[in-house]
Amino acid sequence: MKQWICLILALSMLLACASAEVYEAAGTGKNGDIKVSVTIEGGKITDVSVGENTEDAIPGGVAIEQLPGIIVERQSIALDAVTGATLTSNAILSAVEQAIKDAGLNPDDYRATVAKAGEGVVEEEHAKVVIVGAGAGGMMAAITLARRGVDVLVIEKGATIGVANGWNCGGPMASNTSVQAAEGVKVTDEMLFNDLTEDAYLTSDSRLLRRVIAKTGEAVELQISTGLEMYLRPDNYGAGYRSRHGYNTAKADRPAFIEKAYLEAGGRLLCGTAGETLLTEGGKVVGIQAKREDGSTLNIRADAVLLATGGYLGNQDIVHEHWGNITVNALGNTLSTGDAIRMGQEAGALLEESSFAMISNEFGGSNRKGGGWQRSNGAMTIGIYGGMLVDPNGERFFNEYYMANQPLSVGGEAVLRAGKFYAVVDQIYVDAIASEGLFEFLGAPEDWYVGSMTAKGVVLENLQEDLDKAIEQGWAGKADSIEELAEVFGMPELPHTVEMYNAYCEAGHDEEYFKNPTFLTPITKGPFYVVEYEPSAWSTLGGLRTDSRLRVLNADLMPISGLYAAGVDAGSLYCQPYYQVEGTAVGLAFGSGILAAETIASDLAD
């Protein structure tokens, strides 16, 4: 009898192991949690389905579409991220790993690596011009050259050109466009040049800046010619004119218009192909060696190479080299890993050191513990509200009004250099922001133009719940006294800082950094809150030094024959801090693509 019972039990366990079970797990993607369902039968992963998520259609949607099938096919979680969607990919892989654990299985049994089919294969290709990167600068140059009949080959590291920042951002600044003319708005090259030159204090190349600004309008018209629909955005940050354009065409649809126009003009495109090494002969650049997604090597011979890889947001080593061992949460393309900088320097190019900066997040602070930056969590938003901010020691470190007024540029630069920063508020502040909103709480100040455009009528109704969630995740704290609050993140100077700050609030004058008194809101009624932030950025600035026509220069300030740069890889076009005119980075990137194309065409004709 006992033998029968044991046999039945063993059979039951075997059937349980063999029967299909569905396990639910989640991973943190770029925009929040990604829910994943994993079906496991007899120790085999038979299905992976991605459910509720807030990822962008491009590039996140590419990973959501491709990765589950690859996991099932290879029975492995030791997979490379889908190119261009690293955060989304890692979230899916993390969720599947958790599901494997929940099934009582060992994740290490699901880490088999599969050799890439093309490893060891070397192929040759030729083109008149090779463009590395299919973003704003790269594709403007590509279409311009292809429409002139030039043999152009674009190589893009991502699985689609849609991974590039240029096709995912809010839109470019530009001058003299048909969009402006249709609304009776006048924005001239002179207006933009004067403001950008003043921002840069002449650290950008004035000749180059002048030439690129003159091409920004052409870039808008080129995009419209592809079928993209554009409109004129309001002047949110007080430039005094409406230079920034937006897109009526949905973000996920934009790349298709650009790619179609390029291919119809006779251009060639290779996605999943990363530039690795410039080919040189006698000091001249004569092509590029690239690595394809299947592991094969592609040597491309060309008369000209244009580097337009989008900066280095995905390269923590470069970030640490310039700003120390800090965390910068990426809001833009993490495939931009400084390839142009590395390849250019290997070929003898000079860096434009003065332009290394970042395009900071104008919508709030961020913290990796909370998934980076989450628009849905109001606790992140108060990082740009102009209240008291302190460093890890608990001391103020700048005039916080810059965060409320110029978060993209000057304010963002300050917190980038702080590494971590913290907002400290009381219950009165929290209740007010959640019930009436910041702009109204501050008395609807007439002298805060940016607030009237970006904060008016914005009420963070769920702020209390958002703070509670932040506390649970470990990037915020709550206490009944400032002394207790200081212990949450170990801030010895916080009690003294709050005491002095409250005195400034009572006097109506900031004796330390002379902040606009409108933003002097006291911290007096408990419970008190502290929220920890890390810097976040849409893109990076700082790249190769070029001449006024985007030819890359060597240490003797002479052009390297055959080598050009566009977009943020063209270090001489940008400055530190970032320009204050909204949309400048991508506007100049678009314009630089057209100028680079014209320079290349002229040089090839000589």
Region annotations inferred by a language model:
Residues 21-116:
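Active-site- and interface-proximal helix/loop "cap" or "latch" segments in soluble metabolic
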Residues 118-137, 153:
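Beta1/beta-strand and adjacent pyrophosphate-binding region of the FAD-binding site
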Residues 147-167:
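Glycine-rich FAD pyrophosphate-binding loop
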Residues 160-268, 274, 389, 396, ...:
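Conserved N-terminal/central alpha/beta ligand/cofactor-binding core
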Residues 248-303, 341, 347:
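Helical element adjacent to the flavin cofactor pocket in flavoenzyme catalytic cores
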Residues 277, 481, 492-577:
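A glycine-rich dinucleotide-binding beta-alpha-beta segment and adjacent secondary-structure elements
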Residues 341, 350-488:
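An anion/pyrophosphate-binding glycine-rich loop and adjacent beta-alpha core
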